[in-house]
Amino acid sequence: MLRFARSLYPLILSVTKSDPERGHQRLIQTLKKVDTMHRNGFAVAMEQLEQAFTHADPRLQQTCWGLNFPNVLGLSAGCDKEGEAAAVWPALGFGFAELGAVTKYAQPGNDRPRLFRLPQDQAVLNRLGANNEGAVAMAAKLKHTWDYYPRTIPIGINLCKSKITPLDQAVEDYVFSFQTLAPVADYFVVNVSSPNTPGLRSLQESDELPRIFAGLQSANHWQKPLLVKISPDLSWEAIAVIIDLVKEHNLSGIVATNTSTRRSGLKTKILPQTGQPIEQEAGGLSGQPIRDRATEVIRYIYQQTGGTIPIIGVGGIFTAEDAWEKIQAGASFLQIYTGWIYGGPWVVSDILQGLGEKLAAGGFSHISEAVGIDTIGKAPE
């Protein structure tokens, strides 16, 4: 049945192309139904997902920050904004999942349409605006989930500033969300790089960033791993400053990268849903167009740190080759979202199986041995 579904997946993508946000909402609702069925004693749906989409390989397991990752491929933030399908992501093969972005205050996000697929470019343009129900609502939802399910994969939460919060009050906003959600998650990512919250990306290059890091660490009584997610559009100099701040404030890692506001080289010239030139459309671009830049940023961070700061690599991962490239550049972990949309849920097991083949071909006994091998010995850029 699932093989038949895979053959139909391109048709499903085509049917949902005109309103991808509604299609995504239906996906999340379907996964919620699987969760509900499991809680009500009908475990067969969850078991079928596990059989179809998981790929166990001890060579791909990682231990980091005191957490055990069944494999190195995780779900990127932006997919499960509310944590509604948190219990189901392990059955779809992910080694970890990052929920959110979540803000202190509930917010509706930007006006629709705000999510667009660019199939010619294997990309997605989004200007959702961190629509979510707020930190308190997510905490209650996740507590209810974990009261029923034991966590089998690490769960991260992407923290973003509320739109209504002034930039000079960002510290308190992030700290509130962190303290509210710390009991129900394993690691946290400070999102200062989304292009869809006005002024947010300016925090990456302002005096507020060290204050945010310091405020979060002061509140981190749980000793949760704190990471920062950066933009692919930053200069090398700006990235170097962030690396220094990560070291100074003892952050646990860097997520590289978020979406891009650049539009160069796209095959899509006009956005069909609006009729406007793509260069004039606001939002963050993800998928294949940012693959190479994301890898360059990973390589730069690895070079500058000598591999001492774990990197979660994200941006344009569609195949095992894409994943392997980022591992070799210096990523210890990977995240996928746009590639999962275009390739379907089979992509996770395909990539994991392909990584295992890469390890065998290269004579590696474990994925950690391959991290940064294409970067080691090269002079920093």
Curated annotation (Swiss-Prot):
Its main location: membrane. Its EC number is 1.3.5.2. SUPFAM superfamilies: FMN-linked oxidoreductases (SSF51395). This is Dihydroorotate dehydrogenase (quinone). It is an enzyme of class 1 (oxidoreductase). It catalyses: (S)-dihydroorotate + a quinone = orotate + a quinol. PROSITE patterns: DHODEHASE_1, DHODEHASE_2. It comes from the Bacteria. Monomer. Its cofactor is FMN. It is a peripheral membrane protein. Belongs to the dihydroorotate dehydrogenase family. Type 2 subfamily. The keyword Nucleotide-binding does not apply. FMN binds at residues 77-81, 101, 158, 191, 229, 257, 287, 316, 337-338. Pathway: Pyrimidine metabolism; UMP biosynthesis via de novo pathway; orotate from (S)-dihydroorotate (quinone route): step 1/1. GO terms for biological process: 'de novo' pyrimidine nucleobase biosynthetic process; 'de novo' UMP biosynthetic process; pyrimidine ribonucleotide biosynthetic process. It comes from Synechocystis sp. (strain ATCC 27184 / PCC 6803 / Kazusa). Substrate binds at residues 81, 126-129, 191, 196, 258-259. It is found in: Cell membrane. Keywords: Cell membrane, Flavoprotein, FMN, Membrane, Oxidoreductase, Pyrimidine biosynthesis. It holds the Pfam family DHO_dh. The active site is at residue 194. One of its GO terms (cellular component) is cytoplasm. One of its GO terms (molecular function) is dihydroorotate dehydrogenase (quinone) activity. Binds 1 FMN per subunit. The lineage of its organism: Bacteria, Bacillati, Cyanobacteriota, Cyanophyceae, Synechococcales. The gene is pyrD. Catalyzes the conversion of dihydroorotate to orotate with quinone as electron acceptor.
